[in-house]
Amino acid sequence: MAEYKKIVLLKGLESMEDYQFRTVKSLLRKELKLTKKLQEDYDRIQLADWMEDKFPKYAGLDKLIKVCEHIKDLKDLAKKLKTEKAKVQKKKQGKCKTAVKKKGQDELSSSESLFINKESYKSVPSSKKKGKAIAKTEGEKKNKLTQDQDHLPETSGTDIKTEEDCLQNSPKPPPTSPSSSSNKKKRKEITKTEGGKKKKLTQEQAQLPEPLGTDIKKDEDCLQTPPKPPPTPPSSSLNKKRKSRREEETGVKKSKAAKEPDQPPCCEEPTARCQSPILHSSSSASSNIPSATNQKPQPQNQNIPRGAVLHSEPLTVMVLTATDPFEYESPEHEVKNMFHATVATVSQYFHVKVFNINLKEKFTKKNFIIISNYFESKGILEINETSSVLKADPDQMIEVPNNIIRNANASPKICDIQKGTSGAVFYGVFTLHKKKVKTQNTSYEIKDGSGSIEVEGSGQWHNINCKEGDKLHLFCFHLKRERGQPKLVCGDHSFVKIKVTKAGKKKEASTVLSSTKNEEENNYPKDGIKVEMPDYHV
């Protein structure tokens, strides 16, 4: 995925002019779920990080190509991005084929080695193996058996064949014939006189009669046919050697058969690995939000909105602000408590809804905390009872740039709020221009240098104690349009913090002074108060 991100950032976003870049951000705003604030603040690097998190397969390259194709000045750039993407895919396919070919060659060489070992084992004459077993006998018995072999040269092969037939057909083998023992002694003598394996093999082949070799070959074929080797009597060294060879051949077959079923998956594994997209999870402070590739099933919690994404990766942040806890009505119509906070990483800031008021002490200004198992919805983080919030160690602290802190404390312009889409969430501090109390709700008109907009407060935000000129700090208010006119309305998690200003105090003081003056005029006569003094006589 790193190759695709390089294309998006270095050959895509960096090649655009500022106006073109702002156009691309505007067209991708809904797909990337960018708030108006994030849309304005994001630079090319931050947008590339965000696209990588939202579209992990190709780091958002397909989305960027699609948008560029609809912009007249960026059509050539779209073709260039397609070409670069094709180069990366071709390169990856070549690596996959090379890996599969190399894997197949390794397995083929191992199979050939196994086959050669088996064939070389078969090519060794049975007389050589039997000669080794015969070489162990000692003493006078050797000489006696050697003399007996001169009388029966023609029947040795027949006797060996008969012996093998008996081994296959009867549960107990017959005793070894003298001719078989004489053959053993004959091979033993050849072994002693020659001293080398090659010379010994040559003389054995020369002295043994032809029927003997034929019968031994048939004997080998017969030994491979039965499912179980025949029982070996302790007195027969020849039968022991045949049984040993039979077991070794069976073991080779089993080991080869056990390896063969595993070969196709081994060859296919590199191909599947190359075709599957590699998903990366960003847990560093420079990234925006850890990727949703590490998402877990969302626990059943009524505070979590539909479409929220669970992030289990830890994220280190610095606390900028936090409100006091306040009550809100849950979807189960229960009264619960929560508070709002603002946190920041090294690259951006986040508004946070905290539904566990036991964490209030940790959300102290300039505290460094590590959050995990939290949710993200519309760019706002949500922390509940299942989330983890830990205090960061000194070596885990981060340095938040001043421009990030300034952007977090800044309020959006009202003209920008009016241009927003319905359902967008806004935070900020605004001056109260007018207040109109109605039966069901209260209309608060806020104003700044760019324009004015109505804020509709209901429920606990109906007719709050504020005066014209006061500052209203709005948290989590939603944009709504009625008859084409935009206005901000409160939701379940909305909160208002009132900051009384000097203008508001002066307004209130002048109102009180005016009402006092009217009261005095109404209660006191114009001619003043006439007081009669009693006469005192001494």
From Swiss-Prot:
Residues 299-499 form the HIN-200 domain. GO terms for biological process: activation of innate immune response; cellular response to interferon-beta; negative regulation of cell growth. Residues 276-305 have a biased composition (Low complexity). Changing P297S: In strain: BALB/cAn. Its main location: nucleus. Residues 135-153, 245-262 have a biased composition (Basic and acidic residues). Changing V100G: In strain: BALB/cAn. Changing K6N: In strain: BALB/cAn. This is Myeloid cell nuclear differentiation antigen-like protein. It comes from Mus musculus (Mouse).
